[in-house]
């Protein structure tokens, strides 16, 4: 019998295992996929020019202490997000304009800019206030909330773009309280949106985010991680837990940590069943339509025209793109996010239609026209990832509670049930939705287990 079974080898699960092992506990990690990392997935280019991050990619070593410490510990290399050059806003399919990166689009009137600034500053101020979310804010959608503050049409569109980019949902689909609390966990709205050293999109891993996952797995120990081991049943027998996999293996431990999205608890056979209120809140959580298309080129042709590769779009299918090149290894790419309603439509297309739609939009955004000789039409590799299609993810980034549920079920959401403990970036109060948040939650979940087992001695292996 082990001291602890961890279900899920994403960053929360790996960190939970590491923290528990450091306290002297015996740990086994069970992962349904044939790889570690969860929603972090770095795929090598066939050309040998680095990696494409199909999942989480951005970090900030100064604001995210755990990630920063691990990068130093393992000697991992990072790349700074490229900001130099002009950005582009695509208002409609055939309407685009250029503007200096980091400023409000220049075609807005003074009144429209002031209106956006008012709403932005209000959310920023609310997100910097300590304390729990307000029930009143949890019972209205983000769109209803900003309309109540006097948001104009362009501000409403921009905030909806934020919702799509940040969570893969429309602003009419989740609560204002959840949005504000998410900002609160992540140093405020401005830090989340920032691509410089003040924000969450400052750096990327040179060799892909999975390089950190691999390093963490080495600490856990490969023999302690069982891949391709989907869970069949989880049984809490009061004194210990028994977890059986669909491959016929059975594991026993005094405690079990679930490190999977709460949206997927209902798919597990847990006995006895989770309490009704826990089921009510977790059965209703949703993951956004959060997708990526990564278009790789032989060279960064967009820089020739003074662009930094960043664009945002109301028309889609791509709603935002960034230059994710690693010049050192001759990796030149545009990472395109296809989220929210646009992502739902795009995800229904077959792969070559998805990729064609993205390249067609890139041609319009960068003024390539119908010139088939333009480099935009000549990628060397194209990747796409629809996270809703991924069996053991069902979307990204972090599960979002239903309207009114965040405050109504705060007393049970993410809290231990018997010998079962729950971790994941969704539960973190630091950098929720980011790798740092996953590491934070894993630490806390393991600390719960260590405390609960305190004084009871180690299990006999």
Predicted feature locations:
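Conserved flavin/dinucleotide-binding core of flavoenzymes
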Residues: 23, 240, 259, 289, ...
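Central beta-strand plus flanking loop segment that forms part of the substrate or channel wall
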Residues: 277-305
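Glycine-rich FAD pyrophosphate-binding loop
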Residues: 21-47
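Core beta-strand elements of the Rossmann-like FAD/NAD(P) dinucleotide-binding domain
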Residues: 2, 246-255
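N-terminal Rossmann-like FAD-binding beta1-loop-alpha1 element of flavoenzymes
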Residues: 2-29
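Active-site/ligand-binding neighborhood in enzyme catalytic cores
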Residues: 127-230, 237-240, 259, 269, ...
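Flavin (primarily FAD) binding-site architecture
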Residues: 256-277
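Dinucleotide-binding Rossmann-like beta1-alpha1 core, especially the glycine-rich loop
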Residues: 48-122, 131-132
């Amino acid at each position: 019998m082990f001291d602890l079974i961890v279900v899920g080898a994403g960053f929360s699960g790996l960190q939970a295992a590491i923290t528990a092992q450091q306290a002297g506990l015996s740990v086994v990690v069970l992962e349904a996929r044939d790889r570690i990392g969860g929603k972090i997935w770095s795929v090598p280019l066939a050309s040998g020019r680095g990696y494409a991050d199909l999942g989480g990619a951005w970090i900030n070593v100064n604001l995210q202490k755990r990630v920063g410490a691990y990068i130093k510990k393992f000697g991992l290399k990072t790349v700074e997000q490229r900001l130099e050059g002009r950005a582009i806003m695509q208002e409609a399919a055939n309407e685009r304009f250029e503007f200096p990166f980091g400023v409000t689009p220049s075609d807005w009137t003074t009144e429209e800019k002031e209106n956006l600034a008012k709403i932005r500053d209000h959310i920023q101020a609310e997100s910097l206030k300590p304390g729990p979310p307000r029930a009143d804010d949890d019972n209205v959608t983000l769109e209803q909330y900003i309309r109540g503050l006097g948001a104009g049409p362009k501000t409403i569109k921009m905030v909806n773009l934020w919702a799509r980019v940040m969570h893969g949902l429309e602003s009419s689909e989740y609560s204002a309280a959840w949005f504000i609390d998410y900002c609160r966990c992540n140093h405020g709205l401005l830090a989340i949106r920032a691509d410089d050293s003040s924000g969450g999109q400052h750096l990327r891993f040179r060799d892909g985010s999975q390089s950190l996952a691999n390093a963490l797995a080495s600490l856990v120990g490969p023999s302690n991680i069982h891949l391709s081991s989907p869970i069949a049943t989880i049984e809490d027998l009061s004194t210990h837990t028994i977890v059986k996999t669909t491959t016929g293996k059975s594991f026993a431990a005094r405690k079990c940590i679930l490190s999977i999205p709460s949206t997927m608890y209902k798919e597990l056979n847990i006995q006895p069943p989770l309490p009704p209120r826990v089921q009510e809140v977790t059965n209703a959580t949703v993951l956004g339509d959060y997708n990526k298309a990564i278009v790789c080129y032989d060279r960064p042709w967009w820089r020739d025209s003074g662009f930094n590769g960043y664009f945002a779009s109301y028309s889609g299918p791509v709603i935002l793109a960034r230059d994710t090149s690693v010049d050192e290894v001759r990796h030149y790419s545009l990472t395109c996010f296809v989220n929210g309603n646009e992502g739902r439509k795009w995800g229904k297309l077959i792969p070559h239609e998805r990729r064609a739609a993205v390249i067609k939009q890139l041609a319009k955004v960068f003024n390539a026209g119908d010139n088939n000789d333009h480099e935009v039409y000549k990628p060397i590799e194209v990747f796409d990832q629809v996270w809703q299609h991924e069996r053991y993810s069902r979307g990204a980034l972090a599960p979002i509670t239903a309207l009114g549920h965040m405050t109504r079920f705060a007393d049970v959401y993410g809290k231990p049930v018997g010998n079962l403990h729950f971790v994941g970036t969704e539960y973190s109060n630091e950098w929720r939705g980011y790798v740092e948040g996953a590491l934070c939650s894993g630490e806390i979940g393991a600390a719960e287990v260590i405390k609960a087992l305190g004084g009871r001695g180690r299990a006999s292996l």
